[in-house]
């Protein structure tokens, strides 16, 4: 090793300070580049805007101005947009519309675009997309074939006992997959805990999603948790479960008491259970509307109650998931879970369980062992059984099915670093995380399981990144938002100045522990002040 370093001038003259400075400079300039690009685009668009102080009679500017000044008898939107099509696309070069709105309001001959982008394309019927496609030179279709397809669910009188009433159809995404070039978006940003996405990553995406571990250990406000409602009865006539719905509403109130700053959503398996939950919430608010502000629909992420069919596209900090189905008054449990039981129903489950950023609370009056797979062939039901077990057992289940924090070290270098930490008495994990991007070494706080420091050893993970932006900026920024603090050890520096690097490493760990403790103290003081202010407000 030392002979190799001495023979190579670049390695021999390697400097930690120089390398750290180069990385810091790149990160700063890379961010500036994006800001410059945004400014350039804004400048180009602004320069194209016409001067409304110099209008010619009959021009598109004069038509728009005249219509804007009218108090009544304005032209229909489609007619107006046709008449000022060139002007409106200069003023607003990007239109955000549904496929139906495009066909309704934009004239085919006069309103054309360089590109059309379909988002949530798995839910769009091909026939609904044709009008938009015809108006563009380029088509970009974005969607997830593992999520909700177009459905006639709300056009049918759905009966849980007749699983064929709701039919899924081919989407524009399905139509395009066979004929268009495909690119995968692998990075998953939403979940603050890998536990939230690990089940779907394994069962729907073949562990191809890149997820990011949190520095925070397991707790009640992170991950997936199970709430069993004993002796609840599924009303087969009303198709709902009142006792379970009441427990869901209890959790809504508890959430607003404990985490008023976090957004909240409730997802039910069925429309009937959704309606019952909404009814109980309404009844409680009539008795005491203490959380009126938190129910305000004008909040940035307002509270909602939705069902499997309507929740795609939404996300909240916390999701309460009501299964609803269970034993009836006679004690019988029918293995029918509405749209989940039919072909393709597993996609609805995937949507529902991936809406949360911080935690999912699964509320059910059945447990995983109650579902007998010999009585059903539905993939959705099978995965529901597994997800219930995941919620019941938490990390115990995930560690049994997915690799968490127990991979082998990347290199001898990583082992050496680990030995230094071990000899100094620190507790740590090797290869933290459960997807392709793992943190080389995560050092834990001596008094709990939270990680105080991520140690990166420029190993396989570092060198596997395809770009400098991904390797040196984006990945670390995402992890820092999840609470990580970083310390990088350059292998060349380690081998050239091992004693010095070991001392710096231990100093970095001690500093990280001290900063963690200071932050905990600051949070405690802040919460105490909040409680004091709240008490004063109540007294006033």
Language-model-derived ranges and their functions:
Residues 208-280:
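Conserved helicase/translocase motor-coupling segment
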Residues 438, 442-477, 492-496:
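Short beta-strand-loop-alpha-helix junction that forms the active-site gateway
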Residues 182-225, 367-369, 374:
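Coupling/hinge elements of helicase-like and P-loop NTPase modules
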Residues 156-183, 201, 214, 281, ...:
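Helicase C-terminal subdomain and adjacent C-terminal extension
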Residues 1-112:
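Conserved helicase NTPase catalytic core signature
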Residues 86-89, 291-317:
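Conserved motor-coupling elements within RecA-like helicase/translocase cores
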Residues 74-205:
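ASCE P-loop NTPase helicase motor core
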Residues 111-117, 314-326, 334, 361:
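A short beta-strand element within the Helicase C-terminal
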């Amino acid at each position: 090793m030392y002979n190799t370093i001495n023979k190579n001038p670049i390695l021999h003259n390697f400097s930690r300070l120089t390398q750290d400075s180069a990385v810091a400079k790149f990160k700063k300039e890379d961010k500036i580049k994006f800001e410059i690009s945004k400014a350039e685009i804004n400048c180009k668009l602004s320069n194209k805007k016409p001067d409304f102080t110099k209008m010619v009679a009959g021009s598109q500017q004069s038509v728009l101005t005249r219509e804007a000044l009218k108090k009544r008898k304005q032209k229909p939107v489609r007619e107006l947009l046709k008449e000022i099509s060139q002007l409106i696309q200069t003023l607003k070069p990007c239109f955000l519309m549904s496929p139906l709105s495009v066909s309704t309001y934009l004239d085919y001959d006069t309103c054309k675009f360089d590109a059309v982008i379909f988002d949530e394309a798995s839910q769009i019927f091909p026939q609904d997309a044709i009008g938009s496609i015809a108006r563009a030179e380029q088509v970009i279709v974005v969607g997830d074939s593992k999520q909700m397809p177009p459905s006639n669910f709300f056009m049918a009188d759905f009966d849980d006992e007749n699983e064929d009433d709701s039919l899924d159809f081919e989407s524009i995404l399905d139509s395009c997959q066979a004929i268009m070039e495909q690119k995968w978006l692998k990075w998953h940003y939403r979940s603050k805990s890998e536990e939230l996405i690990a089940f779907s990553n394994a069962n729907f995406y073949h562990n191809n999603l890149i997820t990011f571990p949190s520095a925070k250990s397991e707790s009640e406000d992170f991950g997936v948790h199970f709430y069993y409602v004993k002796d609840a009865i599924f009303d087969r006539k009303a198709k709902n479960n009142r006792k379970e719905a009441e427990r869901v509403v209890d959790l809504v109130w508890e959430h607003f008491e404990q985490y008023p700053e976090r957004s909240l959503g409730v997802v039910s398996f069925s429309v009937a259970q959704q309606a019952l939950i909404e009814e109980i919430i309404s009844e409680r608010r009539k008795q005491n509307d203490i959380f009126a502000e938190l129910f305000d629909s004008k909040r940035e992420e307002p509270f909602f109650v939705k069902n499997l069919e309507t929740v795609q596209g939404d996300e909240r900090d916390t999701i309460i998931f009501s299964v609803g189905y269970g034993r009836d008054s006679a004690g019988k449990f029918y293995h029918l879970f509405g749209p989940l039981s039919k072909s393709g129903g597993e996609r609805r489950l995937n949507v529902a369980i991936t809406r949360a950023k911080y935690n999912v609370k699964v509320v059910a009056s059945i447990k995983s062992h109650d579902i007998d797979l010999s009585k059903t062939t539905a993939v959705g039901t099978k995965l529901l059984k597994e997800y219930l077990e995941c919620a019941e057992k938490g990390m115990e289940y995930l560690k049994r099915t997915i690799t968490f924090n127990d991979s082998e070290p990347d290199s001898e270098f990583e082992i050496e670093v680990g030995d230094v930490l071990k000899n100094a008495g620190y507790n740590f994990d090797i290869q933290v995380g459960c997807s392709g991007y793992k943190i080389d070494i995560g050092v834990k706080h001596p008094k709990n399981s939270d990680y105080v420091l991520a140690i990166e050893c420029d190993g396989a993970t570092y060198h596997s990144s395809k770009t400098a932006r991904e390797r040196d900026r984006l990945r670390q920024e995402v992890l820092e938002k999840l609470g990580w603090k970083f310390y990088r050890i350059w292998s060349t520096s380690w081998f050239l100045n091992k004693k010095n690097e070991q001392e710096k490493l231990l100093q970095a760990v001690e500093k990280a522990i001290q900063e963690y403790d200071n932050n905990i103290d600051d949070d405690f003081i802040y919460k105490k002040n909040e409680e004091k202010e709240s008490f004063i407000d109540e007294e006033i």
